[in-house]
A protein has these predicted regions:
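Active-site/acyl-donor-binding loops of N-acyltransferases
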Residues: 1, 97-146
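Amphipathic alpha-helical "stalk" segments
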Residues: 15, 22, 59, 65, ...
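A conserved beta-strand-loop-helix scaffold within acyl/acetyltransferase catalytic domains
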Residues: 23-81
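A short, acidic, amphipathic alpha-helical segment used as a generic capping/interface helix at domain edges
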Residues: 55, 94-99
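Conserved glycine-rich acetyl-CoA-binding loop
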Residues: 80-93, 104-105
Length: 146
């Protein structure tokens, strides 16, 4: 279902939840006002009509968030929680909804922003017909100056 059909603020809350848990092991989001403001700012850029939410037992289980970026819309997709029941199937439904919607809008390209090691998006991405450049994020520790 389209994110715009949910109660106001729901998709933005889901963005915050998913962003937080997907980054907790390698780049934790702190509980500061600045971090909350940054996540809220990103959430305001979501295209709610094109964002897809998949339900399991009437509750949001996975979301394919869509950002209307120049050149190709960007899709960030994952389950609501790491341990969401039926997350793989729910995520597949959400991504399929976004792809069908893009086709209906005569879009020819979507950019997926995800991590190879995301527990549900990673395996799904390996099954998709992806092409083009892949980006690797490298984190290099900088020694403290004394």
């Amino acid at each position: 279902m389209a994110g715009s059909t949910l109660a106001p603020g729901t998709v933005e809350l889901l963005w915050s939840q998913i962003y937080t848990w997907t980054h907790e092991e390698w780049s934790p989001v702190d509980d500061s006002d600045e971090a909350r403001a940054a996540i809220a700012s990103e959430a305001r850029e979501l295209d709610l009509d094109r964002t897809a939410v998949a339900l399991v037992d009437g509750e949001p289980a996975a979301v394919a968030f869509v950002f209307d970026d120049p050149g190709a819309s960007t899709v960030c997709a994952e389950s609501v929680r790491r341990d969401t029941p039926d997350a793989d199937e729910a995520l597949t439904r959400a991504v399929a909804w976004v792809v069908r919607d893009a086709h209906g809008r005569s879009e020819h390209r979507l950019a997926f922003d995800g991590h190879e090691y995301d527990p549900h998006f990673g395996p799904l991405a390996r099954r998709l017909c992806l092409e083009g450049a892949r980006l690797s994020l490298l984190e290099i520790p900088v020694p403290e100056s004394h």
